[in-house]
């Protein structure tokens, strides 16, 4: 019997102000763990899978139950340790220490590969935490929408003089991460054709308004895109098809999209990518009998897809890797020039990272959407001179359906995160919000990740693979008083290719919370500015000076 599978489970986080735990400092991680497994949030909640192939919230259902039990009895001077989704110890610390410390999927570098991890996973000794799955701060597809939107806006500026009208994006994948592309693309003014092999994912994106239309043939999908472009109104189409097949067919037909990318779960060739010509049922059966054969077939299909992306780039498409390591997989299968198209971070996002700007997010523990709308208004009040940000907040309210507990993503940087968080804490204190909020972020942030094929690709000083930085980030956030801190390996790009840390803090309206919030939400983005200044980026050096950071080697 698989202890990770229980179709009878239906997890819904409590709403309102009644506590199941001894304080909001422990109620918050409990609710956020449960929210990760909400049926509208998680991809396969019955298997504890939140997103990204096999990114889980807990190692198995026994571990999940025990985590909930411990959080409900945990005192405010105790800390729970979670090792790859398993609660392994409770220790006396102090009131300003984290209530939970999490380490997921970490392996000694020589053994940091999928083969070794999968053996440990089968034995029940490990859990793949992805980024926000195992760190209990996933907010559904909204969590990546703004970052994807910012990327597509930058693509329009760099390649099309800022004009996206009448242009379209080709991509693959409509899972927890990839599902953001269709909505973000249309928000940025592009039409989007997204290939997806799992029809239930397309239907889910239709229900939650991330996808406008569904197509079952390439001709039908292209006709929808053409009609929308002629009308001057962007449309998103979920095409039920294998991305490798579609990308190669477009090359064959001589049809060139304006932009090409991909967000299939290519980082995990065993569990995340369906080989060409295979059904999902066939792949599921083969995973039980011939893992090596599945991996080989998946990577061969990735090579076909990447070769098509290169061909489309040659034909004039703006082509980018969106951080799923598909170039690496194709390179390993003999596509020697797989890295000829850039990753999205060095091409479009790094200047933001240099100022500590990244995916700041918050969640209303009350479950009341009005709490999010009030905080949206507070952000506009405190940052009055940023029309781009205001436009994002307006579009988010109008077009993004909440999944589970109401939440908001908002890319802001060093100069704004702490003051926004302190304002939220004050709103809780004054009763303007009906319950506390939690503030966290993706591990994809400026100072919290080492990932040479994604966030730290092509660093100015060649320090792409140096992973001291996320370790320092996690240590500093722990020392600063975050409510829970996590340190993971392999998120986004797969085993052996990344290390990264996460942080979440509770704004419960107390003076003690204000002190913790002020430290954590200054120090956390400041490590990103520090990391980029150390690598030689002038934007980061200037930001550090302007914000008064004490960086000894920058004097």
Curated annotation (Swiss-Prot):
It catalyses: 4-imidazolone-5-propanoate = trans-urocanate + H2O. Its EC number is 4.2.1.49. It holds the Pfam family Urocanase_N. Its main location: cytoplasm. Its cofactor is NAD(+). PROSITE patterns: UROCANASE. InterPro entries: Urocanase (IPR055351), Urocanase-like (IPR023637), Urocanase_C (IPR035401), Urocanase_central_sf (IPR038364), Urocanase_CS (IPR023636), Urocanase_N (IPR035400), Urocanase_Rossmann-like (IPR035085), Urocanase_sf (IPR036190). It is found in: Cytoplasm. It comes from the Bacteria. GO terms for molecular function: urocanate hydratase activity. Keywords: Cytoplasm, Histidine metabolism, Lyase, NAD. One of its GO terms (cellular component) is cytoplasm. Belongs to the urocanase family. Catalyzes the conversion of urocanate to 4-imidazolone-5-propionate. HAMAP family: HutU. This is Urocanate hydratase. It comes from Shewanella baltica (strain OS155 / ATCC BAA-1091). The gene is hutU.
